[in-house]
Amino acid sequence: MNSNVHHRKPRLVFFQWDHQPNANAAGYLLLHMQQQAKCLATHFDVVIISRDCDYAEICDRYEPDLTLFESGYRSHGSRRIKITNTNTHVAVPKLGLHNADPWCDRRAGFLSDMEQWGIETYFAIATMTPEYMPAVKENLFVWPNFIDPEVYHDYGQQKVIPVTLTGQVYGLYPWRQTVFPMIRDRYPCLVSPQHAYESKLASQLLSGEAYARALNASLVVPTCGTMGGEVVRKHFEIPGAKACLVTERTAAVEAAGFVDMENCVFVDGHNVVERLDYLFAHPDEIQRITTAGHSLIHSRHTVNHRPQIYQWFLLNKGLQFGEKIIQSGPFGELAKVKRVAKHESVHIVGKASDRALLNQGDLLLEQDRVGEAKHCYARCLDYVSYLPEAKFRLAICALREGDADRAYDLLVDLVKVTVIEYGAVDPDPVEWAYFLLALICKGQLERARRLQDFYPSLSHEEFRRARLVIAQLGCSGGVVAGLYGRERKSIHQVPDRSDSEWLTWFDNILERCQQPDLANVLRQAPAGGSGTSAKVTAPYFKGDAGWRLRLYSGVDGLMVKLRLTNLRPNVPPLPEFRYLRHLVRALVPKSQRGAMRWIRTALSWPPV
């Protein structure tokens, strides 16, 4: 670390994705990322690295006092950068930044990144993230959204727009779906079109100063924080530009300091018309609320009011044995406490609609009311079509209903999102464990056995149990080593069962999936994998690998034997993961890939 830290701002190297491609689409996303760097610069000498790089080289060149790694972003054109040699310069503290929605399907990728980079402390921009990643909430702090006061302020615009309606209005935003049409049908409105982030049409949307001036010219502007009850940037941008915020009452919004009819207006589908009629009939009330909201934002929610990362840096430098750092709330400061005092960070306990449905479905599934549980999980997808917790639970429901193929397809999709679409080194450990179990339920035990070590750094209790099943069904004595190392974090929460309870549960799953022979072997195997009971002789099971699958497996094994692991695809050697396509991309220059298409086409046929 640089010895001049006391004579200047500490130096922070921020490994930020390359967000520049958004300049040609949703330019406001690029502005958000630039504002994050500006906020960090209030306390740090910030160096931005947005390219593939060697961590050791960067640290040697810039001598940082702290490094911050952006991760978990759901790319809308942004490029995830590759960082190597992160196990060097251990004296430099490292932080992860979950720069995404709390329900994002890249959370498993975020956790994989943190593991690979050796990061154990994280910040998130969303106040609800601890509820969506409970496995890491003890070391997770909130660096909440904010505004740039140089952009969002009172421009003195004449209030010529009664209502401005801006933002997306699809399933993720049920409050807007209810309230916006009621407002649009009754009052004169400036309505912004809805364009996807990655659409070129998004470049036509108002952003920056133009957007702030439109807000400043508006009397009232409604917004909400999604089905998750989050605090989004619009909650701060609207009053920051001196317009009256009309919004949904949530725990997170109240934690930000918003008070009904004092500095904002809380409405729902039952009273929105009544309340807006009152406000438009009493312009002095609108002005009073607007002024108070403007004051709240500029005194608490600008780039100058987000010192949490800097506070962590200072506290961590003097952290003693037996001490830890906690946060007083999502917008609160960080402080040191004694571990023996058992103080914890204060997180928002909200009423996110998807969490409520997941909990309801879990209770129904526990009662074996699978159909009703499926309905709850499917309703989650109406809010977030890619929600991994809902898809994972639907896979469990499919296994309970004996539909191993459906479960397998869902689990394949989950693994694909993390290792292919996001590009993580390995998938969520629980998703991988149940992917292997789904293979077994399809009668493909040998394939599961071959794949169980494909991601060697994965370690989790559910994965250990999947390996135990493979060992017992393969009659290898049923002895499985414990966890390979520290248990990997998962975004999924599974029922708390003993090994014997879990094995009984999976034995039942095998029966439902029409695998009575496998179920019988598992039923007679020593519970818990102790290996102390008499070995069970397994019946003959037909090999489950056709010639194409054997070829895929053979090619992958050859890559390992030839020590070409740096070119080996990071996906299982199976057609459904497009293994050959990834192999060709690694081995063949772009100019020569056309000649390989016929091979890829032949090998992509359904396995026989």
What are these regions (language model features)?
Residues D268-E285, D453:
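C-terminal "capping" alpha-helix adjacent to the active site of nucleotide-linked donor transferases
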Residues M1-L97, G109-T121, G350-L358, L363-D368, ...:
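N-terminal pre-catalytic "stem/leader" segment of glycosyltransferase-like enzymes
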Residues D284-L314:
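A charged, aromatic-enriched C-terminal amphipathic alpha-helix characteristic of glycosyltransferases
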Residues N2-Y62, F69-N85, L97-F236, G240-A241, ...:
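Nucleotide-sugar donor-binding catalytic core of glycosyltransferases
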Residues V303-I348:
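C-terminal alpha-helical cap of glycosyltransferases
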Residues L580-V608:
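Long, low-complexity, intrinsically disordered segments
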Residues C244-V246, E262-D268, N316-K324, K374:
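Short, contiguous hydrophobic alpha-helices characteristic of membrane insertion segments
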